[in-house]
Amino acid sequence: MRHRHGYRKLSRTSSHRKALLKNLAIALIMNERIETTVAKAKTLRSYIEKLITKAKKGDFNAHREVFAYLQDKEATKKLMNEIAPKYNERNGGYTRIIRTRTRRGDAAPMAFIELV
């Protein structure tokens, strides 16, 4: 049984999963909308929402924390200066997942994840 299991492993090792989420987060921040599988989108949602909440503080330490997760100067700058200030009045719920299609090669359910 899968009851009370903590998180999605996405059939990857922990380092591979961490790299995948980092790259998906950078792509979402830079493009504000990406298409991926539903499982990856749901995992990315919790990852990116925690990052945006940290970025909303707006101070130097928050900037360092966000950069430690993303390791990308442009994505960090865009998140801190453009995206986070938009959500000052909003308490969570910064992303939207829209199911789109099944992928032809392996019939994986696909979805768009976008910043609200």
UniProtKB/Swiss-Prot annotation:
InterPro entries listed in its UniProt record: Ribosomal_bL17, Ribosomal_bL17_CS, Ribosomal_bL17_sf
GO CC annotations, alphabetized: cytosolic large ribosomal subunit
NCBIfam families registered for this protein in UniProt: L17 (TIGR00059)
PROSITE patterns per record: RIBOSOMAL_L17 (PS01167)
UniProt keywords, alphabetically: Ribonucleoprotein, Ribosomal protein
Pfam families: Ribosomal_L17 (PF01196)
Gene giving rise to this polypeptide: rplQ
Entry's Gene Ontology BP terms: translation
Coiled-coil residue windows: none
Family listed: Belongs to the bacterial ribosomal protein bL17 family.
Name this polypeptide is given: Large ribosomal subunit protein bL17
Record's keyword annotation contains Ribosomal protein: yes
GO MF terms held by the record: structural constituent of ribosome
Assembly and interaction partners: Part of the 50S ribosomal subunit. Contacts protein L32.
